[in-house]
């Protein structure tokens, strides 16, 4: 990763890397708060520029939540999904700024996000379905023989636990890879700059690295957007599976088609 700013202090008894991560988390939250404030201005006057982008992002996430969770239940999760997307996306982008690191490039941050999502889906599922009905859905339909439902229950439960691992490591791995690639290009540019004029080969390497860096930055923005979107959309899918009964969702879809 690109060399981070050197800190002359630490907080909470953490080392320098941990302190930087905490500072980046705080910076991330402040930027997200500003974006939310910016989006709220559009309610008071005609939105333009960045406000349109914020509004479009919110509408896209809400529409996707409607299609996955259902129009009846989705609104209760709008705020969670939008804030989750903004926090991860902004956190991913922070690492593109020289001297700063993405908070999502820390495994402790991505694991915390994944565990938080998993606990929330369980909380919602238990609250809305009840203990018996919630755990029963892991065993499959009642029409399935009991000899199959018992092992299926444990397989599905293990699969549910594995979501935390896949969510956290997918985000962590992609963001770290992005920052490592940028770090390599920066090293090439800064390392070969003093001797560019002395060697044709070094000059070629420097030129290639200098051209690739803007492209890699744009690629980093794209990766940041995709990873934030994937994390958020998977969260919506997990909520739909845990907290919304298939019968309610199916009947809602039928009513929607009838109304159409």
Please give the residue ranges for each predicted region.
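Selective transmembrane helix interface/packing segments
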Residues: 1-260
């Amino acid at each position: 990763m690109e060399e981070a700013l050197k800190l002359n202090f630490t907080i909470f008894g953490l080392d320098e890397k941990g302190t930087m991560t905490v500072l980046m988390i705080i910076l991330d939250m402040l930027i997200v708060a500003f974006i939310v404030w910016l989006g709220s201005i559009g309610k008071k006057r005609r939105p333009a520029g960045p406000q349109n982008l914020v509004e479009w992002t919110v509408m896209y996430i809400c529409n996707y939540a409607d299609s996955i969770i259902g129009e009846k239940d989705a609104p209760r999760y709008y705020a969670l999904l939008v804030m989750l997307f903004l926090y991860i996306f902004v956190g991913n982008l922070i690492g593109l700024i020289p001297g700063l690191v993405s908070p999502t490039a820390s495994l402790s941050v991505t694991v915390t996000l994944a565990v938080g999502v998993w606990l929330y889906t369980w909380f919602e599922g238990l609250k809305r379905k009840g203990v018996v009905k919630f755990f029963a859905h892991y065993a499959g339909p009642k029409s399935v023989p009991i000899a199959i439902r018992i092992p299926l229950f444990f397989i599905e439960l293990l699969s549910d636990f594995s979501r935390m691992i896949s969510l956290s490591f997918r985000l962590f791995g992609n963001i770290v890879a992005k920052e490592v690639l940028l770090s390599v290009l920066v090293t090439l540019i800064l390392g070969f700059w003093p001797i560019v004029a002395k060697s044709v080969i070094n000059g070629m390497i420097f030129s290639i690295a200098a051209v690739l860096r803007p492209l890699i930055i744009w690629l980093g923005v794209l990766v940041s957007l995709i990873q934030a979107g994937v994390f958020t959309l998977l969260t919506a899918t997990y909520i739909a599976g845990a907290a919304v009964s298939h019968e309610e969702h199916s009947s809602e879809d039928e009513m929607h088609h009838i109304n159409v």
